[in-house]
C-alpha cells in the first residue's frame, strides 16, 4: 500500500476512536441519571464542542455524589459532644409550619437545633472585620478559619497578621482555604503563617498534571469558629473588594456573628472539612465547650456538599418556600435555579404569597449575569416581584419568610451552590432575627428599581437571544 492509503486508514481509525470516546461519554452521562436538563446540557456541549466538551466533562462533569468525606463512624465520634448538649436541652419547637424544616435538617443533615443563641447581623465588611479582629484577639484556645477567598491584600494581611500575633501567644490556629478561590494568592502569603506555627491547608488542591473531576467541586463556605463558642458565617470573604467594592458603587453583603451552641454546627463543619484534607479527626472536649449564653434565638448551622446523598440546603430552601403563607423575600447575586426551586417560587407567588427576588443590576461575571436575566420573565409572569440593586454589587445571600424564618450563608440560588459546592448556612426560627433581616431587605429595596414586565419585554432581541443561549449552559455554570 502507498503512503496515501496508510494515511487514510490512520485518519479513519482516529475518527473512529474519537467518536467512540464521545459516544461512550454521552452514554455515561445518560446512565448517571441526573436531571434531564443537566443531562441535555452536557450532551449539547459534547455534540457541538466535541474536543473541548470531552475535556470539560472529564474535569467538571463527573459526579462524586456517592463518595464520602468522612466515615459514618468518624462523623459519629465528631458529633458525639454536640449530640449530648442537644439532648440535655429542653425540647425545642419552631413556630407554626417551620417545625418540619427544622426536623428535616436534623434528620438529613444532622444539623442539631439549639435555642438560647445570640445573633449579630452585618451588612458591611468594615463592621464584620472589626468584630472579627476583636474576637481573634480575645481567643484563648483555638481559632478556626475556612474561606473560599483569603486574599493577599490589605484585608487579608490584616487578618493574617492578627492570626500570627495570636499564634505567638500560644493560641492554636487552623486555616482552610479553597485552592481555586485562592489560585492567585502567592504561596508566600500562607508560608508566613506556616512559619509561625499556624496550620494551613488548601481544599481539594488542583495542580497540573494531577487534575481530577474534583476541580469542579469547590469549598464556598465562609466559617470562623473561635474557642468553640463564637462563630461567623455568611457571604463575606477575606478580600479588599468586600470593603471597597468593584468599580462604581459599594459591595453589599450579609454576614452574621453567632454566640451559643449553634456554633457547634460550624465547628463540626470545619472539623469535617479539615479531616477530609488532613485525615486528622479532632474530637477533644475543648472544641465543644459548655456554653451558657443567654439569648433568644433558635437556630441551626446547616451544610451541603456534592458528595452527600441529598442536596440538603436546596431541599430545605424548597421547604421554606412552600411553607410561606404571607411573604418570602430573597437576595442572591446569581439566579440560575433548577426546575424545582423555580417552580416552588412560581407556585407560592401564584397562590398569593408576596414573593420578592433581589438581584444586582450589574453582575460581576458576564456569563452568569446573562443567564440569571433569562429567568426573570417567567418569574414576573407568576407574580414574583424582581428588584434590581443599582447602588453597587449585591453579593448578599439572604432569605426571610413570614417574620418567623430566616437564613444567611454562602449559598447562592444557582446550580453550582445547590449541586457542586460545599456550602454552609445558618437558619433561624425566631421573630427578632427575621424582622432584622426583613428590615435590611426593605432598606436595600430603596436602592433598587422594581422591574416591569412590560418594559423588560421591550429589551433588544440581541439580549434575549444571548440570555437564552447562556441559559442552556446554566446547569454547568
Predicted regions and their residues:
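N-terminal localization/anchoring segments of enzymes in phospholipid and broader phosphate metabolism
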Residues: 1-315, 319, 323, 347, ...
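Phosphate-/nucleic-acid-contacting segments
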Residues: 327
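Helical hairpin unit composed of two closely spaced alpha helices linked by a short loop
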Residues: 334-356, 360, 365-367
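Short, glycine/polar-rich helix-capping loops at beta-to-alpha or helix-loop-helix junctions
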Residues: 372-375
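Active-site donor-binding acidic/aromatic loop of nucleotide-activated sugar
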Residues: 386-390
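Catalytic-core elements of nucleic-acid end-processing and repair enzymes
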Residues: 397
Amino acid at each position: 500500500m502507498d503512503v496515501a492509503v496508510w494515511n487514510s486508514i490512520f485518519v479513519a481509525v482516529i475518527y473512529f476512536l474519537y467518536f467512540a470516546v464521545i459516544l461512550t461519554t454521552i452514554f455515561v452521562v445518560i446512565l448517571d441519571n441526573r436531571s434531564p436538563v443537566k443531562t441535555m446540557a452536557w450532551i449539547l456541549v459534547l455534540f457541538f464542542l466535541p474536543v473541548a466538551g470531552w475535556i470539560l466533562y472529564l474535569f467538571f462533569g463527573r459526579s462524586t455524589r456517592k463518595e464520602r468525606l468522612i466515615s459514618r463512624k468518624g462523623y459519629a465520634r465528631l458529633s458525639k459532644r454536640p449530640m449530648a448538649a442537644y439532648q440535655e436541652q429542653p425540647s425545642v419547637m419552631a413556630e407554626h409550619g417551620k417545625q418540619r424544616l427544622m426536623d428535616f435538617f436534623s434528620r438529613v443533615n444532622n444539623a442539631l437545633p439549639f435555642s438560647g443563641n445570640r445573633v449579630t447581623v452585618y451588612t458591611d465588611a468594615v463592621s464584620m472585620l472589626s468584630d472579627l479582629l476583636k474576637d481573634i484577639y480575645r481567643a484563648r484556645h483555638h481559632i478556626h478559619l475556612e474561606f473560599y477567598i483569603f486574599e493577599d491584600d490589605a484585608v487579608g494581611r490584616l487578618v493574617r497578621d492578627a492570626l500570627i500575633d495570636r499564634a505567638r501567644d500560644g493560641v492554636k490556629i487552623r486555616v482552610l482555604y479553597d485552592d481555586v478561590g485562592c489560585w492567585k494568592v502567592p504561596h508566600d502569603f500562607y508560608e508566613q503563617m506556616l512559619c509561625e506555627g499556624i496550620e494551613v491547608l488548601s481544599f481539594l488542591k488542583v495542580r497540573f498534571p494531577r487534575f481530577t473531576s474534583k476541580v469542579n467541586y469547590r469549598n464556598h463556605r465562609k466559617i470562623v469558629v473561635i474557642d468553640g463558642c463564637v462563630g461567623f458565617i455568611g457571604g463575606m470573604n477575606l478580600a479588599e473588594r468586600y470593603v471597597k467594592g468593584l468599580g462604581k458603587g459599594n459591595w453589599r453583603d450579609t454576614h452574621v456573628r453567632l454566640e451559643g451552641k449553634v456554633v457547634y454546627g460550624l465547628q463540626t463543619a470545619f472539623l469535617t472539612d479539615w479531616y477530609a484534607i488532613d485525615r486528622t479527626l479532632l474530637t477533644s472536649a475543648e472544641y465543644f465547650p459548655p456554653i451558657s449564653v443567654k439569648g433568644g434565638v433558635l437556630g441551626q448551622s446547616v451544610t451541603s456538599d456534592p458528595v452527600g446523598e441529598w442536596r440538603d440546603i436546596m431541599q430545605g430552601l424548597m421547604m421554606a418556600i412552600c411553607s410561606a403563607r404571607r411573604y418570602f423575600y430573597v437576595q442572591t447575586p446569581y439566579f440560575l435555579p433548577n426546575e424545582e426551586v423555580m417552580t416552588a417560587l412560581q407556585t407560592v407567588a401564584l397562590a398569593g404569597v408576596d414573593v420578592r427576588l433581589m438581584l444586582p443590576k450589574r453582575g460581576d461575571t458576564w456569563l452568569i449575569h446573562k443567564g440569571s436575566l433569562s429567568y426573570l420573565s417567567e418569574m414576573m409572569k407568576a407574580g414574583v416581584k424582581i428588584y434590581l440593586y443599582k447602588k453597587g454589587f449585591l453579593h448578599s445571600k439572604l432569605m426571610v419568610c413570614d417574620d418567623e424564618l430566616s437564613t444567611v450563608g454562602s449559598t447562592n440560588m444557582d446550580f453550582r451552590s445547590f449541586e457542586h459546592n460545599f456550602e454552609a448556612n445558618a437558619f433561624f426560627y425566631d421573630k427578632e432575627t427575621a424582622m432584622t433581616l426583613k428590615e435590611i431587605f426593605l432598606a436595600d429595596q430603596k436602592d433598587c428599581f422594581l422591574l416591569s414586565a412590560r418594559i423588560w419585554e421591550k429589551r433588544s432581541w440581541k439580549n434575549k437571544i444571548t440570555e437564552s443561549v447562556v441559559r442552556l449552559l446554566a446547569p454547568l455554570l
